[in-house]
């Protein structure tokens, strides 16, 4: 994965930019061949090319049977990668369902981002 993310193996971690550190940490996590990856904001700090590479890797891993659970505020990452979505607000699960069902539940919204903005503005009581 070092080659996939175009990381220089001759550099020490302290010599890397913040974006390169994120790539290094992801390469390390992916190198174990785990069947389940749990990642917090994995595309945070990545440039658009690196984000696209990461999403390609996620799709390849999922095609090989891996499960990837990740948190994000970037709705395009969800649309590009997620089969299912769990929406959490104030520590409570508000919705957990297939992406298509989640989108269908909000026909008056034009996009996933619109849904997220609306849900954040609503006072949801459980």
Q: Where on the chain are the PLM-derived regions?
A:
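Helical segment within the ABC ATPase nucleotide-binding domain
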Residues: 51-64
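ABC ATPase "signature
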Residues: 96-97
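Hydrophobic anchor residue at the start of the ABC signature
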Residues: 26
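A short, surface-exposed alpha-helical micro-motif characterized by mixed small hydrophobic
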Residues: 78-80
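Conserved H-loop
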Residues: 66-74
């Amino acid at each position: 994965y070092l080659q996939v993310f175009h990381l220089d193996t001759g550099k020490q971690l302290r010599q890397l930019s913040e974006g390169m550190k994120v790539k290094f940490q992801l390469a390390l996590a992916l190198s174990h061949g785990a069947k389940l990856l749990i990642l917090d904001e994995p595309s945070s700090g990545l440039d658009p090319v690196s984000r696209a590479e990461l999403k390609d890797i996620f799709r390849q891993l999922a095609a090989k049977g891996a499960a990837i659970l990740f948190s994000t505020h970037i709705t395009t990452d969800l649309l590009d990668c997620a089969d299912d979505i769990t929406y959490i607000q104030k520590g409570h699960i508000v919705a957990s369902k297939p992406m298509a069902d989640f989108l269908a539940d909000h026909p008056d919204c034009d996009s996933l981002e619109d849904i997220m903005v609306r849900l954040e503005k609503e006072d949801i009581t459980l």
